[in-house]
């Protein structure tokens, strides 16, 4: 396997995440604009006017850009669907990710490449063949085992199933990130409880809450599996990535458009390193374990292998929110950067800063710049071991950063 044969697709919900994905070695990014995507109600969403900048930034780095248009589409939204896809084509988008035939058919009609979303629950080669009329890449159902994925891949090859480009249909699979309790993300719980549809990009994440099962006859409350009975742990394939790509997967999709730029950078870096090790013949259980430890330092709900190993029941999270071994704390913002001497002037706003702490700068152009704080100075140049909130300080940086960047530390 050559590293160039496998595509790492990174989630992008902000310009900071876009820069981080590019820094880390992503081959492609996916994102949403407006209300026609599965993160439309999230803060991690762009507007139609952002399209040009996102595509241009990605392409300048040799990275493909995919637009998610993967919600259910209603009749009164047809014009919006056309406007979004028209704009995407005009700005040079590489493909849209869709599930509704209104989006799929219109995109193909005007010559835009289509990838079929996991919402379509593709679970066999006949369905792949059906969608190959319009799509060059399909995301198979997350509930499949690796053996089932391999069977589908064999059928694609043996039956010469090709997409509109004339090439064999590519298999894309989720490799890392959050999993939903429902089949291929088709959930009604949020709509039922809060009138916010998960299938319209407005999931209220009710499955992540703690629940108790009550015996209505006795009133006894049963504490089941830590009570997070609807919340699966996060998918992680880094410790069986050789078998994962060996099943025929060619696009590794990372979940997490609503997660931070530091998450995007760390996850892409780790999977890129694992792929390069597989290529070089140096991929070992010890290396994979080390990568998994690094993955655990950013947002996660604990890890399991998903359904790929054939387990019918999910491993449930033991945490509300993140189980990361480290958490980020906002320190302050960069008020100036002196490029010649690589020193940032930082206004410490929210938490004190001390020598020896692991820190990172984050910005739309900077992406993520991590370092250990080796030295710290007052603005008059006096060395300091720590600085308190409300003060200005000088920090020597390992890489160029920018005015307006945010500074965080890991604790």
What are these regions (language model features)?
Residues 123-128:
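Short, glycine/polar-rich helix-capping loops at beta-to-alpha or helix-loop-helix junctions
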Residues 14, 71, 99-102, 120-122:
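Short glycine-enriched loops at secondary-structure junctions
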Residues 1-24, 28-40, 55, 61-71, ...:
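Surface-exposed amphipathic alpha-helical tracts and adjacent flexible/coil segments at the periphery
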Residues 44-50, 79-83:
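Charged helix-capping and loop-helix junction motifs
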Residues 81-117:
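Well-ordered mid-protein domain cores that form the structural environment of catalytic cofactors
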Residues 132:
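Positively charged, amphipathic and often flexible ligand-engagement surfaces
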